[in-house]
């Protein structure tokens, strides 16, 4: 059996110490990185708290009327002129007093053609279809909206049929045609709505009809990006890790 002398042990110690220090450095570096990397938002169930962080300050306005809000139940209806359509005695009236997270491309439009939807509807898709879960929770497709209008919109597609809308919600310009199942949003929301549809088509392959494409291309040109839309896109990137390329390129061109 080979004996280790005092001199050989002294030579081995620096090597052992160096390896130990190197191991500790690698361990602590990987630990630091794991804490530094925030998990990216990827599902609708956990989207609420993240969206509340995104829509603060100037971005805390609802999609359909531009009403500012502070907290989900504190909507300032004076600047936007919103007035509930429903009778205060009806249960649905409560939704007029709160902010909800609206899918610009509806969950039905994202999922009704998928096998999971046919087998059990939206809930089944949420829990059993990973791609649908990504679509449903994509922050680019979610926007704060007054609950009553969100409910009235239902699964209706966006459209444009009049330049003189007859008010339905006070002086708010968004209107809903329940018979034809379509929604005409206010002018200030149209460009953003168009660019979100382009994003969802590119990101997830949700095809647009010829009619919808023509409408959204027109809206995209008529209603260019604003500083607020560009800021929204940057905030979403912080939490989700990606930007809407149709917004990003337009923001750069506009100098935002």
Please tell me what each predicted stretch does:
Residues 1-17:
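N-terminal secretory signal peptides that target proteins for export/translocation
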Residues 9, 30, 66-68, 81, ...:
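Secreted/luminal cysteine- and crosslink-motif detector
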Residues 13-14, 28-29, 106-107:
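Alpha-helical and His/Cys-centered functional microenvironments
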Residues 20-30:
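Bacterial N-terminal signal peptides
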Residues 27, 63-65, 78, 114, ...:
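Secreted/extracellular small peptides and ectodomain modules produced from precursors
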Residues 32-36:
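Sec/Tat signal peptide C-region and signal peptidase I cleavage site
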Residues 37-98, 216-218, 228-229, 236:
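Aromatic-lined ligand-binding clefts that engage carbohydrates, nucleic acids, or primary amines
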Residues 83-85, 89-256:
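Domain-level detector of nuclease and nuclease-like folds
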